[in-house]
């Protein structure tokens, strides 16, 4: 057994290989800070920082344009939501269960939607004002309530893939909302760990975690009256970040009008800092993890929004999850503390 030490300002964390526990999933990430400056002769991504016009006649998501299925978009003025023309889940899917020895398959029902953040083809969330992002937040709330209320829908996943390097098929500012009958793998892990902690402590694990982070703030990059933006202690991606409400809430429907405004502010601050980091339109995948819509109490849930950006050391060098990370566990070089310092310095 090892004697516990105070992790604050522990120089071992900045100099030696170690692993860190993700309290939400129970998984570990290997941290190798001494590798941060290793030479790079690998792949460099193409930098697509060319200026885009506010309207693209060939874009399927621009206002007034016709989508691939023949439907015409309305001339929307702010946020536009529609059912995905190429949905990954089918509402009418047969809820079958098929078993053959060790082989098992279950039918999965769901509804997938696309949410256009703005009619302006050239904008990302980082380019939008908090009041504009607030309209996106309101749309997320409406869709979460509507989809979560559909019979047989037990989970609603809100997410965004930004940038071609993240597999985004259209540069128009947009995200997606997938709702389904079962809980996804990541959500199952987070549900179990949050429930276990809540049963023992009658408090949410993220509430206690945020309270601890706010003591020294070495991983906190921004906070307002209701939200904390930080690099999680267990972050996997180089500049991974998380937005967490200071008060325990199980989903975004519990946000007051003022809290929704402060959520939009937190998103604006983080995404603008990202763009300044390498002077580019910073790619990432982001998503909101919140309580299932299965009709259960779910008071152990503390919703949060994660940002997983791939860029490592420049606008053209990204982190690859390969080799050991595919067969062993995730690994990172730059520490969460170093990443937090860099991002915090970019916030006005």
Question: How would you describe each model-predicted region?
Answer:
Residues 5-172, 178-258, 271-272, 283-284, ...:
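Active-site microenvironments that recognize anionic phosphate/pyrophosphate groups
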Residues 286-290:
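Acidic/histidine-rich, metal-coordinating catalytic segments
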Residues 262-281:
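Extended C-terminal subregions enriched in glycine
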């Amino acid at each position: 057994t090892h004697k516990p030490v105070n992790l604050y300002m522990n120089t071992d964390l900045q100099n030696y290989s170690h692993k860190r526990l993700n309290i939400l999933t129970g998984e570990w990430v290997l941290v190798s800070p001494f590798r941060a400056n290793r030479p790079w002769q690998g792949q460099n991504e193409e930098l697509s920082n060319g200026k885009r016009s506010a309207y693209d006649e060939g874009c399927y998501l621009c206002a007034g344009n016709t989508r691939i299925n023949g439907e015409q978009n309305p001339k929307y003025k702010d946020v536009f939501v529609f059912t995905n023309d190429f949905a990954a889940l089918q509402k009418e899917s047969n809820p079958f269960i098929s078993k053959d020895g060790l082989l098992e398959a279950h039918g999965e029902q769901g509804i997938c939607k696309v949410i256009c953040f703005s009619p302006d083809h050239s904008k990302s969330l980082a380019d939008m004002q908090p009041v504009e992002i607030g309209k996106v937040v309101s749309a997320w709330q409406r869709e979460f309530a509507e989809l979560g209320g559909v019979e047989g829908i037990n989970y609603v996943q809100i997410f965004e893939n930004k940038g071609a390097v993240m597999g985004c098929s259209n540069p128009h500012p947009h995200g997606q909302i997938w709702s389904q009958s079962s809980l996804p793998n990541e959500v199952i892990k987070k549900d179990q760990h949050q429930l276990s902690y809540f049963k023992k402590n009658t408090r949410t694990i993220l509430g206690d975690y945020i309270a601890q982070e706010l003591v020294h703030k070495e991983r906190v990059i921004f906070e307002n009256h209701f939200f904390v933006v930080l690099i999680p202690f267990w972050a996997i991606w180089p500049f991974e970040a998380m937005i967490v409400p200071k008060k325990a809430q199980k989903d975004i429907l519990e946000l007051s009008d003022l809290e929704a405004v402060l959520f939009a502010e937190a998103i604006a601050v983080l995404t603008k800092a990202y763009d300044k980091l390498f002077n580019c339109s910073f790619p990432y995948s982001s998503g909101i993890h919140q309580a299932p819509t299965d009709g259960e109490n779910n008071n152990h849930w503390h919703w949060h929004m994660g940002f997983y950006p791939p860029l490592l050391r420049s606008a053209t060098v990204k982190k690859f999850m390969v080799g050991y990370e595919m067969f062993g566990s995730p690994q990172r070089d730059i520490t969460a503390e170093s990443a937090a310092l860099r991002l915090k310095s970019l916030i006005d």
